[in-house]
């Protein structure tokens, strides 16, 4: 009996969150704000990638960033130097954000008027993938030192993401990491997954990623305008 109750509660939590996420997406569409949920392991280079990516995105878009961590404001302080609007979210021990937490963060950020908000989720390959934040795009980073077998071990995050960044390609010669193999493993989980090999350290590949994101955001907004016309 106890075990059945736990499963039922968990299902209810996910269902409630999914409904809240759909409402949030609709509200963001109405105000013209596109939300990206950025997920990865700790140390994969999320913040360094954003430092490279933001100046390119800011050429075309008004961008805000929400930095989620269990504690500390180091990342928010770093990102603020790019000139992007940024807030720090402390999760109080939670290993992920859900739609309700994301909504609260967007209100604090005053996201209305921004073209794009990037949520840098808590560093974790498991929990963040389980909760819909209301984002239009789930984007993940896998770094070369983590190994090319991660799609086999952590399938859900690869299944829920629309694109994967393979970061730290500048250290490929020093690690047993096969780019073709990780591509095959990842697309076994998600055949439509877009893959971008980059080096946040050198900047290699980042411009192609920025161009793809800008095109995707523009296309999404144009489709919404046509639907609402």
Residue positions per predicted region:
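Conserved C-terminal guanine-recognition region of P-loop GTPase G domains, centered on the G4
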Residues: 128-135, 142-192
């Amino acid at each position: 009996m106890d075990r059945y109750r736990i499963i039922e509660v968990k299902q209810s939590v996910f269902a409630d969150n999914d409904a809240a996420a759909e409402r949030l997406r609709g509200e963001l569409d109405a105000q013209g704000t596109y939300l990206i949920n950025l997920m990865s392991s700790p140390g994969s280079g999320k913040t360094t990638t954003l430092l490279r990516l933001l100046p390119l995105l800011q050429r075309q878009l008004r961008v805000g960033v929400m930095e989620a961590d269990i504690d500390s404001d180091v990342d928010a302080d770093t990102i603020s130097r790019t000139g992007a609007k940024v807030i720090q979210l402390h999760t109080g021990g939670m290993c992920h954000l859900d739609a309700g937490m994301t909504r609260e963060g967007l209100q604090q950020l005053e996201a209305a008027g921004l073209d794009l908000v990037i949520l840098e989720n808590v560093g974790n390959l498991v929990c963040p993938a389980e909760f819909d934040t209301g984002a239009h795009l789930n984007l993940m980073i896998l770094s070369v030192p983590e190994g090319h077998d991660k799609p086999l071990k952590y399938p859900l995050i690869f299944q829920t993401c629309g694109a994967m960044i393979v970061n730290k390609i500048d250290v490929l010669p020093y690690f047993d990491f096969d780019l073709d193999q990780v591509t095959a493993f990842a697309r076994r989980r998600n055949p439509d997954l877009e893959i971008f090999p980059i080096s946040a350290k050198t900047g290699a590949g980042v411009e192609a990623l920025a161009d793809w994101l800008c095109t995707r955001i523009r296309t999404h907004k144009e489709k919404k305008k046509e639907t609402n016309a």
